[in-house]
């Protein structure tokens, strides 16, 4: 299963211009097996037990739930619902919604802003990011 450039733009890159959306489609879109999408709950059916996380695991690493305000694939309500599932844990957890951004927010031309926010969030919680050395 694969996405056409038009469908990619509508679902993933709806806040971008056609040129940037087409470049992202060319670079990142690859066919995916339908079973994978079904396991993730993206095929309209029930989620597979393989796609369920242990929200009560206090020993897990930090979790920053990032979303775009204009995301058509995972709406803000879905991200907030996931955050609420993790709300009772003592593990570091936080939500962040970026205004005027779509699902492509971590791969489009504004990705550095999102990355800087995530690094700052980690720093606020006393967590040092391990950045690659040049």
What are these regions (language model features)?
Residues 1-31, 35-40:
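Helix-rich cap/lid subdomain of alpha/beta-hydrolase
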Residues 72-81:
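Conserved alpha/beta-hydrolase "acid-adjacent" motif
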Residues 59, 65-67, 71:
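Short beta-strand/loop motif that positions the catalytic acidic residue
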Residues 7, 23, 81, 113, ...:
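Alpha-helical elements of Rossmann-like donor-binding domains used by nucleotide-donor carbohydrate transfer enzymes
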Residues 49-60:
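The feature captures the conserved acid-bearing segment of alpha/beta-hydrolase catalytic domains
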Residues 41-49:
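Short gly/ser/thr-rich secondary-structure transition/capping motifs
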Residues 81-82, 88:
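Mid/C-terminal beta-alpha module of Rossmann-like enzyme folds, strongest
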Residues 89-134:
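Catalytic active-site module of serine/aspartate enzymes centered on a nucleophile-bearing elbow/loop
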